[in-house]
Amino acid sequence: MTKKIEEKIEGVIESLGYLLYDVSLVKENEQHILRVSLKNPNGAVSLDICQQVSEIISPLLDVCDFIQDAYILEVSSMGLERTLKTPKHFKLSLGEKVEVKLTNKESFQAVLKDANDLSADFELEDHAIKSVEYKDLKKVKTLFEW
């Protein structure tokens, strides 16, 4: 269902100058919550941006009626520290410092340099590039340095 929602709202969000990072539908305390997270290629995602996007996509979602039950729409920034789960997440996080855990239990910190549909390239501290297929990644999360 979230894939259909993503397909419906992605073009609208891009027409406003922002990028759709993720869509998730969760249930918390018996309440359905549709979470839409954004990236602003020109800077931070402000509260005004979240409100603007929410006001535009809310009626669109109501008309499409993808979600049968009542739900709350939450629009937010993709966040400073987040887990990268899809090739799209990797592509939208290029240049960021990440912590990588591999399925073989190896782990390292690096800068995400490139990503495609099959693998991601990481620049290690010694500036060497390590290419890893997604199937070999256990967990990758962005790191925010204060």
Swiss-Prot record:
Entry annotated with the keyword Glycoprotein: no
Top-rank lineage group of the source organism: Bacteria
GO cellular component labels: cytosol
Repeat among keywords: no
Signal peptide annotation: none
Keywords noted in UniProt: Cytoplasm, Ribosome biogenesis
BP GO terms, sorted: ribosomal small subunit assembly; translation
InterPro entries recorded: Ribosome_maturation_RimP (IPR003728), RimP_C (IPR028998), RimP_N (IPR028989), RimP_N_sf (IPR035956)
Subcellular location: Cytoplasm
Family membership noted in the UniProt record: Belongs to the RimP family.
Function description: Required for maturation of 30S ribosomal subunits.
PANTHER family xrefs: RIBOSOME MATURATION FACTOR RIMP
Protein name per Swiss-Prot or TrEMBL: Ribosome maturation factor RimP
Organism, scientific name: Helicobacter pylori (strain G27)
Gene name for this UniProt entry: rimP
